[in-house]
Amino acid sequence: MADPQPRSDSPSGQSAVSHDEDEGSVLGTGLTTRHIEAFGRKVTTTASHLMAPKSDPTLTTHYQSAMSDIQRELRRPTVQRKVFSFAQTTPTDLVRSKLSTSEIQYRALSALPDELLANIPEDTSTYSLFQGFQASMPEDDNEHRKSHRRRRSHGQKLLEDSGKSSRPLPQTVGSLKRERDVLNRRLEMMGIRKNMCSAEIHEIDNKIANLNNMRKIVLDRLAGLEMDEAELEHELVQLDNRLEDMEEAMEESATLISTPKAVDDEVTLDSENQAMDASFMSESIYEKIPSPKAWKHKSLRKRSMPILHEHFEPGSMIRELQAHNDMITAMDFDVPFGTMVSSALDDTVRVWDLNLGRCMGFLEGHHASVRCLQVENNIVATGSMDASIRLWDLSRASYAPRDNRITRDDEEDDDDALGYEDPSAEPPPPPPSSMEDCPLFSLEAHVDEVTALHFRGDTLISGSADKTLRQWDLVKGRCVQTLDVLWAAAQASSIMGGGDSQWRPTGRLPDASADFVGALQCFDAALACGTADGMIRLWDLRSGQVHRSLVGHTGPITCLQFDDVHLITGSLDRSIRIWDLRTGSIYDAYAYDHPITSMMFDTRRIVAAAGEDVVKVYDKTDGRHWDCGAGVTAEEEGITPAIVERVRIKDGYLTEGRKDGTIGIWTC
């Protein structure tokens, strides 16, 4: 009896079973090597039929026409782009997708290479990119506010009418849940927006830090350029001086060659007679005529103005110098980062290079402390307690801005160093020969100490404790006019009918240490002078008379300065007053807690020394008062700066001198 299901041992049966298993493996696990080989044989067979020669009788023309159509289709750009998109997909994906066009296009567009995925930075954000996108979408806040107001007003109305109305609430549980979900969603969006704002703030802070670093680099570059400019200008001045000396020497030699000997003898006799006359005239101190060097006023202008300090924050310290060993009595400088001259009660007058903070040398010649000085371009005028006035030409100083220590001899003494590293140490003496060619001449006619001076052009005005003002001609080197302040006060009181009192101090408490002439300034024929009686007198140098007196201070005048419209004065009565020169009235006034010892202004600010360890600054543009100096951060740093005695400001570049001999340089 035969079996209902006979077992077949034929190869065809085995191949059928294995074929089913292989097909299952293809669908389940993917391609195998056997399937790839079978697919290759089929492709080879098909290609052999397609590429057979035309002489083959078994070949039909259908294959030839089909290949031509396929070639035309493949040349289309759309088909080529599809082929390239296929190339980005693995064969396994092609088989799994069963060559579906839509799926292949989706995979080609959405697939990202591993290189791009590896470059994605790690993010610690608690929200996703899609949530951030949703949070960045604008919302209608007005509708939300209106609905919130409606709910609040309706709730209040329900509370008010709870006893009158018993109708049920219109909201259902579902609507309340939906409203709660909406509010939770809004709250979630609010949190995401807060995180986004915080991230933006951190990003802005990083950008600001990077910009500050870039700004610092550019500032260092600007400082180097200005230093190079200063060196070049110094070399130009030296070359101009050498050229001028050579021209003078050539003129003198030509004059000596062309002048006969007899004429030289007559000139010698005349010079001897003039010398004898000068010796007789020197007995009268009011008509002493010095024999100075030839005065040649040169209006030197700097070709470039420093602008580095304009890029600092106001109140920033640029440098601090331990300039002297005693209280600063006077100081002045020409331009920011230029040349400064300072004097103190240690009987020294020092010249400083503000660009490097180094001492250039000493101005020696006075026999006592210098009380007042002025720097104008390369000319310096100093007034001393020895009753003399001396003028100096700093362009003749032998000073190298950058002293190359490598090129110096080893046996050279280091006592002539121009700088010092320890600010607390005593400043070392600069080279003794650096300023030996700077003195021009001396003006000696006062009989008491010189307390104030000012020069402009070829005219210098000086005020002394001998109660006189003197006008000097710098070309001839002699006094051309003497103004008696007491006589002028007496004349003014007699004209105004002031009785028999000729000098009437207006101060509440007389100060014996106050200077009789506290400050003065001249411009052409106009002179403003402040004295110990608290009066500001405006003189006309052409007539030698006082044409106006400004009354208002109750203490000695210590400082003044005027421009085209206003005159600003400071006094020991602790006030600073701004006068209108057109009307003679007070335009503005303000006061401090201590007497004013020094004051100066530029186009924007008025700075004053008012008996404190800071400089008092008044901003004229916005009327703001603020402090500048070492005393601002004294408590934080644990230091006790000395009292500020003298201040100078030009173009926002502030210098202040203190009682301990320290000079601070600030931006203002």
UniProtKB/Swiss-Prot annotation:
GO terms for cellular component: mitochondrial outer membrane. Disulfide bonds: none annotated. Its main location: mitochondrion. Residues 193-259 form a coiled coil. Keywords: Coiled coil, Membrane, Mitochondrion, Mitochondrion outer membrane, Repeat, WD repeat. It is a peripheral membrane protein. Residues 7-17 have a biased composition (Polar residues). This is Mitochondrial division protein 1. It comes from Coccidioides immitis (strain RS). The gene is MDV1.
